[in-house]
From Swiss-Prot:
<dbReference type="GO" id="GO:0005829">
    <property type="term" value="C:cytosol"/>
</dbReference>
<dbReference type="InterPro" id="IPR027437">
    <property type="entry name" value="Rbsml_uS13_C"/>
</dbReference>
<dbReference type="InterPro" id="IPR018269">
    <property type="entry name" value="Ribosomal_uS13_CS"/>
</dbReference>
<keyword id="KW-0699">rRNA-binding</keyword>
<dbReference type="GO" id="GO:0019843">
    <property type="term" value="F:rRNA binding"/>
</dbReference>
<dbReference type="InterPro" id="IPR019980">
    <property type="entry name" value="Ribosomal_uS13_bac-type"/>
</dbReference>
<protein>
    <recommendedName>
        <fullName>Small ribosomal subunit protein uS13</fullName>
    </recommendedName>
</protein>
<comment type="similarity">
    <text>Belongs to the universal ribosomal protein uS13 family.</text>
</comment>
<dbReference type="GO" id="GO:0006412">
    <property type="term" value="P:translation"/>
</dbReference>
<feature type="region of interest" description="Disordered">
    <location>
        <begin position="93"/>
        <end position="125"/>
    </location>
</feature>
<dbReference type="GO" id="GO:0000049">
    <property type="term" value="F:tRNA binding"/>
</dbReference>
<keyword id="KW-0820">tRNA-binding</keyword>
<dbReference type="InterPro" id="IPR001892">
    <property type="entry name" value="Ribosomal_uS13"/>
</dbReference>
<dbReference type="InterPro" id="IPR010979">
    <property type="entry name" value="Ribosomal_uS13-like_H2TH"/>
</dbReference>
<dbReference type="GO" id="GO:0003735">
    <property type="term" value="F:structural constituent of ribosome"/>
</dbReference>
<keyword id="KW-0687">Ribonucleoprotein</keyword>
<comment type="subunit">
    <text>Part of the 30S ribosomal subunit. Forms a loose heterodimer with protein S19. Forms two bridges to the 50S subunit in the 70S ribosome.</text>
</comment>
Length: 125
């Protein structure tokens, strides 16, 4: 397996798809990277030369924040919002959706499994 930005890239996949295994590189960035380096998107990772791998590695690490740096930056942004007490920070702290989604129903991924609350008992006859 080839390593780019500290990630093992799958050898059998097309390069455009394989680059998306790097955190911070989606289809658009993969396409931009290949256009800038002049490498075909249809090439398989196993067919790349060492020079092409070095060129890709230098371009990605030089132009984009990826993997650990990006994860740290995102975590720092969330931490800052929590510390200053913004609305978004409060939502993060409470474990609720941050971007305005409804919570009366749905939002189960963010809220976790249902916790049953005792309700009214049925009146006997």
């Amino acid at each position: 397996m080839a390593r780019l930005a500290g990630v093992d890239i799958p050898r059998e996949k097309r390069l455009e798809i394989a680059l998306t295994y790097i955190y911070g590189v989606g289809k658009t960035r993969a396409h931009e990277t290949l256009a800038a380096t002049g490498i075909s998107a249809d090439v398989r990772v196993k067919d790349l030369t060492d020079a092409q791998l070095v060129e890709l590695r230098d371009y990605i690490e030089g132009n984009y924040k990826v993997e650990g740096d990006l994860r740290r930056e995102v975590a720092a942004d969330i931490r800052r919002k929590v510390e200053i007490g913004s609305y978004e920070g409060l939502r993060h702290r409470k474990g609720l959706p941050v971007r305005g989604q409804r919570t009366k129903t749905n939002a189960r991924t963010r809220k976790g499994p249902k916790r049953t609350v005792a309700g009214k008992k049925k009146a006997g006859r």
